[in-house]
Curated annotation (Swiss-Prot):
GO terms for cellular component: cytosol. It comes from the Bacteria. Heterotetramer of two alpha and two beta chains arranged as a dimer of alpha/beta heterodimers. This is S-adenosylmethionine decarboxylase proenzyme. It comes from Bacillus subtilis (strain 168).
Length: 126
């Protein structure tokens, strides 16, 4: 099935509090994840929240990687979207391992498959 991209949404639970709260660690992890998947890094932007948490994005030529971390819950919300031949699971796996996630739930969505076609219901009067 040909797509314009693949989008992995990853729910990470049981992650290390200190890693989820360390902006520099998360930034390096995301850049390395992008590079490991074969992506070309274009822009990097991360923000540290008070009292805890980090959000950020790595823009790649092939799309993006994002995170929103909730250290107090040991939870991270991860998106990895790639176009072309890159496998987003390579980056998502790298990130999950780096954050020491105990539990991981993934959904992979093919992107750019065309508009969703919904057929109109036709009713007959009896």
């Amino acid at each position: 099935m040909e797509t314009m991209g693949r989008h992995v949404i990853s729910e990470l639970w049981g992650c290390d509090f200190d890693k989820l709260n360390d902006m520099d660690f998360i930034e390096k992890t995301f850049v390395n994840a992008a590079l490991k998947s074969g992506a070309e890094v274009r822009e990097v932007a991360f923000h540290k929240f008070a009292p805890q948490g980090v959000s950020g994005v790595v823009i790649i030529s092939e799309s993006h990687l994002t995170i929103h971390s909730f250290p107090e819950h040991g939870y991270a919300s991860i998106d990895v979207y790639t176009c072309g031949d890159l496998d987003p699971n390579v980056a998502a796996d790298y990130i999950a391992e780096a954050l020491h996630a105990d539990t991981r739930e993934n959904i992979e969505i093919p992107r750019g498959m065309g508009p969703v076609q919904i057929k109109q219901a036709q009713a007959k009067v009896l």
